[in-house]
Amino acid sequence: MAYRKRGARRETNLKQDERMQEKEDSKNINNDSPKSQLSEKVLSKKEEIITDNQEEVKISDEVKKSNKEESKQLLEVLKTKEEHQKEVQYEILQKTIPTFEPKESILKKLEDIKPEQAKKQTKLFRIFEPKQLPIYRANGERELRNRWYWKLKRDTLPDGDYDVREYFLNLYDQVLMEMPDYLLLKDMAVENKNSRDAGKVVDSETAAICDAIFQDEEPKAVRRFIAEMRQRVQADRNVVNYPSILHPIDHAFNEYFLQHQLVEPLNNVYIFNYIPERIRNDVNYILNMDRNLPSTARYIRPNLLQDRLNLHDNFESLWDTITTSNYILARSVVPDLKELVSTEAQIQKMSQDLQLEALTIQSETQFLTGINSQAANDCFKTLIAAMLSQRTMSLDFVTTNYMSLISGMWLLTVIPNDMFIRESLVACQLAIINTIVYPAFGMQRMHYRNGDPQTPFQIAEQQIQNFQVANWLHFVNYNQFRQVVIDGVLNQVLNDNIRNGHVVNQLMEALMQLSRQQFPTMPVDYKRSIQRGIFLLSNRLGQLVDLTRLLSYINETLMACITMNMQHVQTLTTEKLQLTSVTSLCMLIGNATVIPSPQTLFHYYNVNVNFHSNYNERINDAVAIITAANRLNLYQKKMKSIVEDFLKRLQIFDVARVPDDQMYRLRDRLRLLPVEIRRLDIFNLIAMNMEQIERASDKIAQGVIIAYRDMQLERDEMYGYVNIARNLDGFQQINLEELMRSGDYAQITNMLLNNQPVALVGALPFITDSSVISLIAKLDATVFAQIVKLRKVDTLKPILYKINSDSNDFYLVANYDWIPTSTTKVYKQVPQQFDFRASMHMLTSNLTFTVYSDLLAFVSADTVEPINAVAFDNMRIMNEL
């Protein structure tokens, strides 16, 4: 924000004292060179130089120094010229601190997003695996032989009330994360140890299963079959078949993955088209392609659908984060300026132009404040990165530094108004109007009303009669980005007058008109200060035209590498820009052209493509999970966590700090999107086989039987004597879902009181925070209290009765005087038995192909000599040599 210098009266007294001091200094220092005198007068007093990065302009502490310290200051002037110049340079550097601190962590997160296709698949996708389980005789003794069953590979249940449903939702999420974009069976095939002729099976897990079965007590026919297992190659068709041991559901998954691979043939035409068109057609870049691509080359087309969530619309926090990340990335690829004018030489020249040896007005010393090459480079990068990422900027300046304001006139000319936060833009424009424009024509100060829909420049345009000045104001007022769709991407493009630099001539005409005015209401010193500031800038007309052209060219070249629509919306936070750094850029820009290297462009393009593709894939995942949650009746419960997971997987967001209202708005946007067909098919596969998956789990039961009186335990071939029921014959059945939906528990109560066991049918975990009893806890407590009291409500796990603590192999059957009982039985269906021949499937894929993720690695690129680089109008970018 602009602000005026406080303590003005006090400063005028100080200035008179300082002028007297300067006269004394000039008498004492006759031996020093004129340059030394000049530098000392301009830069020795800290209180004379006001830096833009201060929030308040305070009177320097040096004013308060004692007479002793002032005499020390006089002694310092007598140092040698060389030492003194070093001090001056150091002091200048101290006065402007670059505003930007690179957040390397964000940049690393962006660059670390790699295409998922790069992950090499080493195993098939599996939910099931065969396991050996013991067999118990009728008397409870364990047999020596085992039986194989299909069990879940990862048998885990999440915490919560609807555990089983959440299990299936988590399973689906796991499938989505592991769903491969392509499968090349040759890469994962391993040797079958039991093969006669060194044959191979599809993956290491199949080999391990074959090995375990071969060593088990299996019939000779099965061993012979394993010995025959090997791959079958059809070289003429580039096809290979591998034997695999898979559960039928796993086979359906992998067969689906094989038939819906995303790989496409890769050739030079695609690589050529993959390079952004504007870079292909840019004569400054020389591109060559390696034409030796093998016929087996493949690639995975990146998913570059445009932003379906419209994050710029009502997602302020998310939009701020994404633009910040883009800003940091863009700054990292904007080239550094080269061969800037020597800071010291330029300050000396400016001092001569200002004739500061005949110093009569204090404000002119501020013209030289903070001019250094670091600030110039910082400003250059900030402007381009902000335009590329559409980050809003705010301006820091001091109203009394006329040079800053005149530089600000160039800035407002070449950068569209929308790029600045309105309060900052209004303050800067008001300072320019009241400090330079209105005083030149003798007009009264503009009293701007806060909240006025018009900006100060728009008001001034209507009041100023001078054609050139009004014409320039009109250009600035209507300077906006043009929205152009290039290669399907919305670009924010600068006005053609800015791109070719002609607008700088328009600015100079306005400045010349202002410098010729009489400033009738102002002192002569004031008029001269403004004129000298304009003179300093107008001396650099050629360099400013070149700078404007260079700024536009680099902005457009890097913009070609952006793949997401450039939406222009004001951001929550802003990038600070000091007008003294703009002065540094204007005064120090040389004639050396800098253009981004091809490697930088390709890197920027790849990072943008990878982020954009990952963004779309994560949207597809989130939409699929929302649909699955809806179908599993988990919609309300899981929704916020689904959206949080979506944001976490984008890597750049701090999810904990995103406001809830934006989370729910994001949920609503995701809910409206269609599900991608592959993800929908995968969910349907899971939904159709939920019962098989439940049966294979050791933690999921298909129901529970509860009774008023104890029921005798039954012998089970897999577990011995346990409270597990394998069928529901003879029990009254009630569906758990219906029970929870209706809330009518009278039927259960009546049956239990009549000593009729009730079977509640539905998937539930053995151990759960919300047991089946708590699901029916709304019963009349007086009737049901005794039933609840007689059982462990939170543990439904089967009870295993052992003979003694030393043996895990035998179960209690011999004590005929005591019959083990339980008031609760778990209804658990028998898992599917493992049948070797029924589980052997042949999978088919290409014999070989190579997937390339970095397509630009095939392109060798170089640039013309920077001095010969041309802009869009086929003229050299930098003409002022």
Curated annotation (Swiss-Prot):
Primary role: Inner capsid protein that self-assembles to form an icosahedral capsid with a T=2 symmetry, which consists of 120 copies of VP2, with channels at each of its five-fold vertices. This capsid constitutes the innermost concentric layer of the viral mature particle. It encapsidates the polymerase VP1, the capping enzyme VP3 and the genomic dsRNA, thereby defining the core.
Start and end residues of each stretch annotated as 5-fold hub: 1-82
Region (Disordered), start-end ranges: 1-46
Record's GO cellular component terms: T=2 icosahedral viral capsid; viral inner capsid; viral nucleocapsid
Organism: Rotavirus A (strain RVA/SA11-Both/G3P5B[2])
Listed name of the protein: Inner capsid protein VP2
Keyword field: Capsid protein, Inner capsid protein, Repeat, RNA-binding, T=2 icosahedral capsid protein, Ubl conjugation, Virion
Pfam family, any one: Rota_VP2
